[in-house]
Amino acid sequence: MLIELEKANKFIDWLKNMLFLNAKVKTAGKRVVFRGQVYFCELGEGMGSEESKNRPCIILQNDLGNKNSNNTIVAPITNGGAIPTVCVAIPNNTYSYTDNSGNTTFLSGNILLSNIVTVSKARLGNFICNLSDNDILMEEINEKLIGSVGLYKTFKKLNDTITSDKKAITRLIETRNKLTRENEDLIKQIEKLKNNLPKEEK
């Protein structure tokens, strides 16, 4: 087995950083973050094609989980190659932030929903921006996230069932309204006939 010296040194450096972050776990666990927010996240040194280094990541975990857990679920944002079916592009020149050098820059790149990962909140650095107010972007994230974790067919089947049920309910309401109108018409006709009867026959 051949071990790359450069890679080994990177893992050693990451181990030092990991020990530092581990010391912050308890206090960082109290940090409240929200779904759709973007933070710098120390992903460390990855293996193979795993995303690594300190990079922007979007919070994907629901807010209840974010409140009660020391961990959260994130997806990395990168300017590298992206697969359209499981990636969402950040709108250009829209979300500005101050980088580590104090310069104002814009968030750019693609949200890699094929690389979602659970991380300790201790890995989270500075807040960058909030994407949750962009309904169109968040809807695209949700749709592609469903596809990334293999739930597209399940959700499509559920959605088709809901759509079918809504149509059936609409038809039932229309039928009920029609029968109600017919019943009201019959009552009016009966009252009219009763009023037309001779007094002694009433």
Language-model features and meaning:
Residues 1-10, 90-202:
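C-terminal terminal-subdomain/extension
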Residues 1-32:
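Compositionally biased, charged N-terminal/linker segments
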Residues 30-31, 64-65, 101-104:
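A general structural signal for short secondary-structure junctions and capping/turn motifs
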Residues 35-38:
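Loop/turn positions that initiate beta-strands
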Residues 40-42:
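Regulatory nucleotide-sensing modules
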Residues 44-48:
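Short, charged beta-turn/beta-strand-edge "cap" motif at the junction between a beta-strand
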Residues 49-98:
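Compact nucleic-acid interaction/catalytic patches
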